[in-house]
């Protein structure tokens, strides 16, 4: 192997290694622990799931395989319409992860895009929890 080929090989290997480190670090914030609960943050998982004005990430708090609560994270939805969706966040409280995944709450009239996005965020977050707990 020539010196130039060797440098090229090691340069590519170093870039691949850095990409792996960055991607591993990138997902470290999806599942965390707060106050003895497992918390799934859907910000990175659901960038493509949009409400009316953009993404609507949530934090899902889980303890002993039960959903304790779902919190909306900062988003760009119109506050007037997003306020209609807030009661939906309680739909999963107290349910086991399996029951929460199987449940299908009704879309909120007048905030269809936002409520649909919240439901999809919770679904993706709970599936991620099941796959990575």
Model-based region annotation:
Residues 3-11, 19-116, 120-133:
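Flexible, solvent-exposed loop/hinge segments and secondary-structure transition points
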